[in-house]
Amino acid sequence: LLISYEEPIEPIIENQGVKRMQDFIYSQIEDCTYCVMRYRGNEAEVVIPDSQNVTVLFDRLFARHKEITSIHIPDTVTDLGELLFDGCENLRHIELPSSLTSLWGYTFCRSGFEEIVLPDKLACLPPFTFKDCKNLKRVVCGSGMKKIHAWVFGGCDQLEEVVCGPNVEISPDAYKTKALNT
């Protein structure tokens, strides 16, 4: 006997600036912008709905969601929180929005992708951004990149190439990894 149950898609419930829609809980941060505070799903392919004007993905939003293999982030997002994708070891595809201007520390820590292209508006990689990304081989920085802090690539033992402009200030400790022998 097989019994299955599918939860219906929940409508948006508003309560003092907090909304819930599908697998996401939003919090209003300004007049017309929202922060995604929680993810309660278990999908392999995650799409953050663009029906809300989301500008921030909050700290640890997808942390330890090992089931995630790809994620779509809407073009309204400007900030990615700390430890956002920590432990998403099966994450293979992520396309960052061109609107992205800010990352917090450890954003992609222990994620599973092999390559990432950073948007032009992103000017800085904070410490430990890609810490222990064991599969990471290639990073392409956008034209607006100005600073790569210490330990950004710490523990990225498969890292082969980081492409960035000639005027980027790079910490001497940014590439502490076996792959680049530094």
Task: For each feature predicted by the language model, list its residue ranges.
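Short, Lys/Arg-enriched N-terminal segments with co-localized hydrophobic residues
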Residues: L1-R20
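Structural signature of tandem-repeat unit edges
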Residues: Y5, M21-C32, R40-V56, K66-D79, ...
